[in-house]
Amino acid sequence: MTAMRNAEVSRNTLETKIAVAINLDGTGISRLNSGVGFFDHMLDQIARHGMMDISVECQGDLHIDAHHTVEDVGIALGQAFSKALGDKKGIRRYAHAYVPLDEALSRVVLDISGRPGLEFNVEFTRARIGEFDVDLVSEFFQGFVNHAAITLHIDNLRGKNAHHQAETIFKAFGRALRAAVELDPRMVGIMPSTKGSL
């Protein structure tokens, strides 16, 4: 029987108080309360398209702006992801996904490598989506990458609507994560690296 791949992480600073939980083998259920509506909508895309159960509770310094909230949720989710993944034996490790939404198309390629790295190539067509600063999209992914220790390439290949650009990115990220953490029946108990470690 496969061990449960889930984890909980709490992170408390002077800027945010966060509790997150993740189940890598879930059904796409999310309970999200970051205090930032658009961000919750994007996190829901990761859960639904990644078939992961994700819970986020955050009290942040939103009287300043959403920067600390979004970045710190990325950090906490990255920590929870790494913890839930465990020793990484048997996973497929590499994955990619293309996701369209009307005129927008994004590609996400990732490697659960043990080496944090983000290549974020997105030129949003406007600076804000409602009240949400689009610069925070890369801040979320940088926080996640640094603490999940994955290599992540995000490219928005085309798009005119900034909401569509963001949504295709998060959907593709969820789908790529789902494929990368999938257990390969031919790799049971085997580390997916010629080095023998990740």
Curated annotation (Swiss-Prot):
It is found in: Cytoplasm. Its EC number is 4.2.1.19. The keyword Disulfide bond does not apply. Pathway: Amino-acid biosynthesis; L-histidine biosynthesis; L-histidine from 5-phospho-alpha-D-ribose 1-diphosphate: step 6/9. InterPro entries: IGPD_sf (IPR038494), ImidazoleglycerolP_deHydtase (IPR000807), ImidazoleglycerP_deHydtase_CS (IPR020565), Ribosomal_Su5_D2-typ_SF (IPR020568). GO terms for cellular component: cytoplasm. CDD domains: IGPD. Gene3D superfamilies: Imidazole glycerol phosphate dehydratase, domain 1 (3.30.230.40). GO terms for molecular function: imidazoleglycerol-phosphate dehydratase activity. Keywords: Amino-acid biosynthesis, Cytoplasm, Histidine biosynthesis, Lyase. Its main location: cytoplasm. It is an enzyme of class 4 (lyase). One of its GO terms (biological process) is L-histidine biosynthetic process. The keyword Metal-binding does not apply. It catalyses: D-erythro-1-(imidazol-4-yl)glycerol 3-phosphate = 3-(imidazol-4-yl)-2-oxopropyl phosphate + H2O. Pfam families: IGPD. It comes from the Bacteria. PANTHER family: IMIDAZOLEGLYCEROL-PHOSPHATE DEHYDRATASE, IMIDAZOLEGLYCEROL-PHOSPHATE DEHYDRATASE HIS7. Belongs to the imidazoleglycerol-phosphate dehydratase family. This is Imidazoleglycerol-phosphate dehydratase. It comes from Methylobacillus flagellatus (strain ATCC 51484 / DSM 6875 / VKM B-1610 / KT).
